[in-house]
Amino acid sequence: MKIYRRAAITVALFALLSCTDEPHQGSTAVSEISAKVDTLDEKIKSAIVGYDWQLTLDHHRMAQKENSYTPPSIATIFSDPDVNSRILENNSQLIALDLPFKFLAYAEPGGNDAILAYTSAEFIASRHDLPASLLVEYSERLDSVLNLVENSTISEVETEQIGKDFAIVKIKSDFDFETTIERLKETINSLPDTIWFGELDYQNDAKKIGIELNPTRLLLFGAPEPGAKAMNSTPKLGLDAFCQKLLVFEDEGGAVWAAYND
């Protein structure tokens, strides 16, 4: 399907442009830094035990299963339906591409320290031209996690070059919402070496708290081997580039769109 092929090209380009022969530490050093990353990730998870929707992507260990290598890196994603819904209510559905909350515990190639990156409120505000007041609850949830780690551990995401709709590709579908979702899933699941991680139905979550949203759903999937090659020298790519996020939504006029990070 055209939409998925274009998203898959992004993975392929990362793989082609990344160094596949990047040297990495010996097994003892890797085990030691991996333990530090695990400990940092456990702190994140201890702060989100009350959230029903959670997803963990251990990029390092998924790469090992494919006989590939990327430095220790674990992405933790969790969803707060109240926060998501209030941000999306009466605002662009494209914001959902940067929701829900995502943290990445990782180490740089050859590094000895565990680092934490996350999708900040400032990033979302810049990319979607939102007032800071709309993201107060989002920031509060972030702080409840960030307060558990040392400031020196945190790697900030630069926002100076981020403008409205920065690096977002949007494609109009020829099909209705449910058919688009079905065709995308069929295509994704038919591809070798591609893993389906899950989906998040923003409309359904909003309905539970009395907020009306147009159909909006986030699909999560990835290919560990090319992902590992891309992240080999730049593991921080695991914050937004991997896994792949494909947002499908129906706008006010009834048109169906698919959007993803370029």
Question: What do these predicted regions represent?
Answer:
Residues T20-E22:
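Bacterial signal peptide processing site
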Residues G110-S144, L247-D262:
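A short, solvent-exposed beta-edge/loop patch
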Residues E32-L55, D174-G198:
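Amphipathic alpha-helical segments
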Residues L135-E178:
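Surface-exposed beta-loop interaction hotspot
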Residues R61-L99, F197-G198, Y202-Q244:
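Compact, glycine-rich, soluble single-domain proteins
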Residues T28-S34, I124-L135, V169-F175:
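Second-shell loop/turn segments in exported
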Residues A15-S18:
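C-terminal motif of bacterial Sec signal peptides marking the signal peptidase cleavage site
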Residues I3-T10:
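Sec-dependent signal peptide recognition
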